[in-house]
Design a protein with these regions (language model features):
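Residues on the lipid-exposed face of transmembrane beta-strands in outer-membrane beta-barrel proteins
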Residues: 20-24, 116-122, 178-182, 196, ...
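Transmembrane beta-strand segments that form the barrel wall of outer-membrane beta-barrel proteins
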Residues: 2-3, 266-275, 318
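Short secondary-structure subsegments characteristic of cysteine-rich extracellular domains
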Residues: 9-23, 283-293
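Long hydrophobic segments that form regular secondary structure
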Residues: 1, 121-126, 256, 369-382
Length: 382
């Protein structure tokens, strides 16, 4: 448990973490662990209250408000304990601590997360292993904020109605991976390690919601919930919600490692990845890579030099990498309705009449979207 109390207005943070790791051999046959299972799990809950950062824009924000206020001006009235009123230098003067408190202090964020991995390892023969992993990722969160009505200077810093905001959501993802590996050697000089595997990963299973309203029945944070607002009114009530974009990635891969007397080493890798982020016919990408190394200090002609150079390895590699990081279904064209950010109005007949709300093309379709491929070559020494 971690609790960090601060001297800032109304701030606090608590976090609780639980970790669980274990491994069990269920079937043992002589020197072979025939069947082994295990898991690693991490659960985290956090609760954050009050201030977390300065609010406002680049120019007009809490830091600017504090810097422009005279250091002789008290934040609180010693007689009443309330926020002090500023000296009326001009009509825009106000107490920056009071504004920061009213706009930022009364809020709470809660976060829950679970990351778990469960595995099963089967070793029917020496150095032959079949490993299966299933991982799950879960998170959920909620936010609640309350801004009371206030009057800091009678002109610019006035808020006549209290406001409540609630947000939240959840997200889920999972991954399954299965690999088969085998290690062997020839004459104890030529050592090989081979691996074949497949992975499927699904992410983006989740949703978000958000809402705000004014005129809460009870003027305090404890009762600050959307259900306690007096009315639902256009211009003062906002509600929104959306689902995440689901994305699936399937992969097949293979790898061979070769080592000759710890002198000469080589690795060949080939993988094929299929992503649902692309249209049919463009979802699969193929990415090979090779690498080689020469341990020069293992050569006989280096024996006399080991007193000054005990290790020298020259290595080189080449490979291709794939990138599928874009929003799900971006290859499809989408339409959008006009809103406060995107104006789309149409006239029927005379343009002097009343315009009608319309729709517009937000994204053009592109069925040719596919993997972004980059090539990388490295040469170096250790």
């Amino acid at each position: 448990t971690v609790a960090v109390p601060d001297d800032e207005v109304g701030s606090g943070f608590d976090r609780y973490t639980i970790r669980l790791n274990s491994e069990h051999t269920l079937i043992k046959l002589k020197d072979l662990d025939l069947l082994k299972v295990g898991e690693t799990m991490t659960m985290v809950y956090s609760d954050k209250k009050g201030l977390d950062q300065a609010t406002g824009q680049t120019t007009w924000n809490d830091f600017r408000n504090a810097f422009k206020t005279s250091p002789l001006f008290p934040a609180y009235d010693e007689a009443t304990g309330e926020f002090a009123d500023p000296v009326k230098i001009n009509k825009d003067e106000f107490n920056p601590v009071a504004k920061m408190y009213y706009n930022s202090a009364m809020k709470q964020s809660k976060n829950y997360s679970l990351n778990g991995n469960f595995y099963l390892i089967l070793e029917p023969l020496k150095n032959l292993r079949w490993r299966n992993n299933f991982g799950i990722r879960y998170s959920s969160w909620s936010y609640r904020g309350y801004v009371p009505a206030y009057n800091l200077n009678g002109s610019t810093e006035v808020k006549y109605r209290n406001t409540v905001t609630q947000q939240g959501g959840m997200g889920l993802g999972w991954q399954f991976e299965s690999t088969l590996s085998y290690d062997f050697s020839i004459n104890n000089q030529h050592k090989f390690s081979a691996l074949l595997g497949t992975t499927i990963d699904k992410s983006g299973l989740g949703e978000n919601y958000s809402g705000s309203n004014e005129d809460v029945e009870f003027d305090d944070f404890f009762h600050a919930y959307l259900g306690n607002a007096k009315t639902v009114e256009k211009g003062r009530t906002t509600l929104s919600g959306s689902a995440w974009g689901v994305s699936t990635l399937a992969s097949f891969f293979g790898r061979i490692n070769y080592d000759y007397q710890n002198k000469y080493m080589a690795t060949v890798i080939m993988r094929a990845d299929g992503s649902s982020n692309f249209a049919r016919g463009h979802r699969w990408g193929y990415f090979p890579s090779v690498s080689a190394g020469w341990n020069v200090t293992e050569e006989e002609f280096m024996e006399d030099a080991k007193s000054v150079l005990n290790y020298l390895k020259i290595r080189a590699s080449w490979g291709e990498n794939g990138n599928n990081k874009l929003d799900a279904f971006r290859y499809l064209g989408t339409m959008a309705l006009a809103n406060s950010q995107n104006a789309a109005y149409y006239y029927f007949g005379d343009k002097s009449g009343t315009p009608f709300i319309g729709s517009f093309i937000e994204y053009n379709s592109n069925k040719e979207l596919t993997w972004e491929t980059s090539r990388q070559t490295d040469i170096g020494f250790d």
